[in-house]
């Protein structure tokens, strides 16, 4: 259950309302007027909490839960207690997300500009923005309407931020154009120089980075994630991408629409990801590669060559999942101690 010290849920809601919000179907039309006061885990729920079942391993908890209402996939309906009201959805996790948004809507403060914020006179600030203490907004920067900018955040010269963005505390943004409905979590760094040098025996010679960073609409950038600007071209993050905490995106990288980049991933310069690519935790990709649409790199996979659309790869170096599994089986066999011959 949530900690009401920090988050108090809206509601209560009738189950019929939650069915409409989530696009779910009330099983056998039962429970329309049942009230739901909040969301909870199966093991912690009380009578008027709504729970969710989306994996078979939780069937025992479903049987023993005190909750009277459950979001459930159609394949699990037959396992639910007879006394339980069911919201049936082919993707229970999506239904849960939509219902959770209703219980915990984003709080948007009224327009406010702190007296300690430093805003250059040529900057343009949209209507109803919340700009916290210690914020700096540079020359010719443009901030869209309804934006929230957290404490001690730096917005550099010429940066453009679209409407209804949330830029949290201690973020720095330079050389960037950011779309609408973007969320950037604390400590993120966007638009700094990339790691580009020309080297010989006499030293390392810096390559100036004259490009920028382009971030689309409905993107989320995790805490302490770094996105370097391009050298001559731009670094691009397309619409609906999700970048977790502690991700490194090198200069000139392109990340296609809807891609998911999990924590501690590193993407070296000029690599291009197609749409809906997933890079799982601690995956690494060297520079100047292409990762095709819908491809997946499993956790800690290290990619040294192009990956085709739809492929799933893992290991170090990353290979197809079937080949990786063969390698693991071989290693297990190879390192297994041999029995001593009988004397």
From Swiss-Prot:
Per the record, the pathway is:
Bacterial outer membrane biogenesis; LPS lipid A biosynthesis
Q: Active-site residues?
A: 251 (proton acceptor)
Q: Which InterPro entries match?
A: Hexapep, LpxD, Trimer_LpxA-like_sf, UDP_GlcNAc_AcTrfase_non-rep
Q: Which UniProt keywords apply?
A: Acyltransferase, Lipid A biosynthesis, Lipid biosynthesis, Lipid metabolism, Repeat, Transferase
Q: Which GO terms describe its cellular component?
A: membrane
Q: Does the keyword Transmembrane apply?
A: no
Single Gene Ontology BP annotation: lipid A biosynthetic process
Q: Which Pfam families match?
A: Hexapep (PF00132), LpxD (PF04613)
A GO molecular-function term, please? N-acyltransferase activity
**Which superkingdom heads the taxonomic lineage of this protein's source?**
Bacteria
Q: Does the keyword Acyltransferase apply?
A: yes
> What EC number(s) does its UniProt record assign?
2.3.1.191
Reaction(s) this enzyme catalyzes, per UniProt: a UDP-3-O-[(3R)-3-hydroxyacyl]-alpha-D-glucosamine + a (3R)-hydroxyacyl-[ACP] = a UDP-2-N,3-O-bis[(3R)-3-hydroxyacyl]-alpha-D-glucosamine + holo-[ACP] + H(+)
Q: Which family does it belong to?
A: Belongs to the transferase hexapeptide repeat family. LpxD subfamily.
Q: What does this protein do?
A: Catalyzes the N-acylation of UDP-3-O-acylglucosamine using 3-hydroxyacyl-ACP as the acyl donor. Is involved in the biosynthesis of lipid A, a phosphorylated glycolipid that anchors the lipopolysaccharide to the outer membrane of the cell.
Give the quaternary structure: Homotrimer.
Protein name (Swiss-Prot/TrEMBL): UDP-3-O-acylglucosamine N-acyltransferase 2
Organism of derivation:
Legionella pneumophila (strain Lens)
Gene name per UniProt: lpxD2
